[in-house]
Amino acid sequence: MAQIDFRKKINWHRRYRSPQGVKTEHEILRIFESDRGRIINSPAIRRLQQKTQVFPLERNAAVRTRLTHSMEVQQVGRYIAKEILSRLKELKLLEAYGLDELTGPFESIVEMSCLMHDIGNPPFGHFGEAAINDWFRQRLYPEDAESQPLTDDRCSVAALRLRDGEEPLNALRRKIRQDLCHFEGNAQGIRLVHTLMRMNLTWAQVGGILKYTRPAWWRGETPETHHYLMKKPGYYLSEEAYIARLRKELNLALYSRFPLTWIMEAADDISYCVADLEDAVEKRIFTVEQLYHHLHEAWGQHEKGSLFSLVVENAWEKSRSNSLSRSTEDQFFMYLRVNTLNKLVPYAAQRFIDNLPAIFAGTFNHALLEDASECSDLLKLYKNVAVKHVFSHPDVEQLELQGYRVISGLLEIYRPLLNLPLSDFTELVEKERVKRFPIETRLFHKLSTRHRLAYVEAVSKLPSDSPEFPLWEYYYRCRLLQDYISGMTDLYAWDEYRRLMAVEQ
């Protein structure tokens, strides 16, 4: 096992215009303060205020959006980071681990990773992801990429259809089709900060949001040693070279994770489990009394002094005894949140320290709060009650189905841009208006300038005389559409769909 030295991981250099001659702790901290400013002031963070946490298109400001959720995750991440550093200081290990002058950057990277952890999520959350992937699967049929004979391939895009005698072009076609059918919010987050927003963050800060290490074009089983780290796509083909450079800069082996990402993940797990239940009470899906009984029933038999007793029952009893000063609802969730944090944060911090050799190497193949402990059972309890009584509620399911229809409908509306032959789409990009393509011209004008420029830049770097050019051009054209639609807020996507379907009231 490699020696633990965080000076080899907390890399403050950037992809472009990297700071030179940095030596002191104060100078290093200023670099990460610059990252904080870039992140907090970015449009991607602002858009989170109109993206779904659990309840799409919610008008009640007391119910969480992705932004308010991310701010809560940021605070929990800060708490865990401080707890880790405090415990390492007590053990006199800060200097041994190269952290004695990097405590500020350590905390800042965790905080900003938490704030950014959802920036790549499309409108309507996981149902938005499913809509994008289903729509592209119905067009590209990635499962046919291994079909024999090749004439069985049902892909509707000529450039990406497999052809006899065209290896290695067929290998690239398989990768592209698989990649485009695996849109994922975490992978889109990497694409946002590097390719679309060009935030030029430090290598360490970007490493903090690389939650999953599986490329989106991966086919087949993942290695047993990395099956948890690779359970979802973490980056796209378009960012392959950037991620390769990131691994080099952060001393990460293939498919390994940056150490501070485990803290961000734990903070997210702790935050959303309680928050989803609180939002459900705010939405009157159930009362606090009903929630308590759901939790009690799901946990089952327990003894006095058990974690359930110390966290949930304690919160219930305290909220009932002080009902005159604040509402029972407010008091119950205040105590539940405090009790949960006071048990789970120290546990997550100790798990991080106990497994630091594997975490530092990036190979710890688990979440900090997924084990056989009571702390893990408590999180599972919150999640299971939410799945059974919140996510399956008719109002929630109806809104999710509407969100799925909106995203699918928008993709269908913009489909003419994908149907244009390469030469015609190139003409449209160059001229921005082509008389014989009135619909496509107007659709193209609606695309964000930022996304159009990202497409132009990517295609301009391709050798136009290469047989791979039509494949890559179509890939980036699909990315253009995915970038645009996934970057919408819930409300904008809803309104845009109604406008373009001519059903605006």
Swiss-Prot record:
Keyword match Hydrolase: yes
GO molecular function: dGTPase activity; magnesium ion binding
Keywords: Hydrolase, Magnesium
EC number: 3.1.5.1
Transmembrane segments: none
Residue intervals of the HD domain: 66-273
Cofactor(s) annotated in UniProt: Mg(2+)
Cross-referenced CDD domains: HDc
Alphabetical list of Gene3D superfamilies matching this protein: Hypothetical protein af1432, putative deoxyguanosinetriphosphate triphosphohydrolase like domain
Catalytic activity: dGTP + H2O = 2'-deoxyguanosine + triphosphate + H(+)
Entry's Gene Ontology BP terms: dGTP catabolic process
Cross-referenced Pfam families: HD (PF01966)
Record function comment: dGTPase preferentially hydrolyzes dGTP over the other canonical NTPs.
Homology family: Belongs to the dGTPase family. Type 1 subfamily.
Quaternary structure and interacting proteins, as annotated: Homotetramer.
Protein name: Deoxyguanosinetriphosphate triphosphohydrolase
Organism, scientific name: Escherichia coli O6:H1 (strain CFT073 / ATCC 700928 / UPEC)
Protein's gene: dgt
